[in-house]
A protein has these predicted regions:
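Beta-hairpin "wing" of winged helix-turn-helix
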Residues: 77-91, 96
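Residues that scaffold the ATP/ADP-binding catalytic core of kinase and kinase-like folds
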Residues: 41, 83, 104-105
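Alpha-helical DNA-recognition elements
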Residues: 69, 73
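Intrinsically disordered, low-complexity polyampholyte segments enriched for Lys and acidic residues
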Residues: 1-9
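Amphipathic alpha-helical dimerization/coiled-coil segments
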Residues: 5, 13, 20-21, 106-127
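Short beta-strand/turn micro-motifs at beta-sheet edges
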Residues: 24-27, 82-84
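N-terminal helix-turn-helix DNA-binding core of bacterial DNA-binding proteins
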Residues: 26-68
């Protein structure tokens, strides 16, 4: 059965719960969370790959092989802009959030808050 594209978030999260009671985070949900985290890191000011990874350290583990496709997707979507500049004899790509990126960040934060409310209702705030 195909799911409708605009599915209520509470249903979507509930659908992801397995019989064991462990929340199975769907790939799309992971993408959304990672996008929000990366946009948040960039929203603090122009940044580059290694700095973004460092800024997110202790919050979420993200590798270069995960980060760069996210950045490319965000750039293609118009959520970040890039510029290339030389740093210590090497070219470095800098990322800057756009107005659309800020809107996506705020919407993503709102979605995460809704998911958190659902999680607390299901699990009583405990893992």
């Amino acid at each position: 059965k195909k799911r409708k594209k605009s599915v209520d978030k509470s249903y979507y999260v509930m659908y992801s719960i397995r019989q064991s009671g462990v929340l199975s985070v769907d790939i799309q949900l992971k993408k959304g969370i990672l996008d929000v985290c990366v946009l948040h890191a960039i929203s603090k000011g122009e940044s580059y790959g290694y700095k973004i990874i460092s800024d997110l350290e202790g919050v979420i583990e993200i590798s270069e092989s995960t980060l760069y496709p996210i950045l490319k997707r965000l750039e293609t979507g118009g959520f970040v802009t890039t510029r290339t500049a030389e740093f210590s004899g090497r070219l470095r790509r800098y990322y800057k959030i756009t107005k659309s990126g800020l809107e996506k960040l705020f919407a993503g934060r709102s979605d995460l808050q809704e998911i958190n409310v659902i999680y607390k209702k299901i699990f009583g705030g405990r893992l």
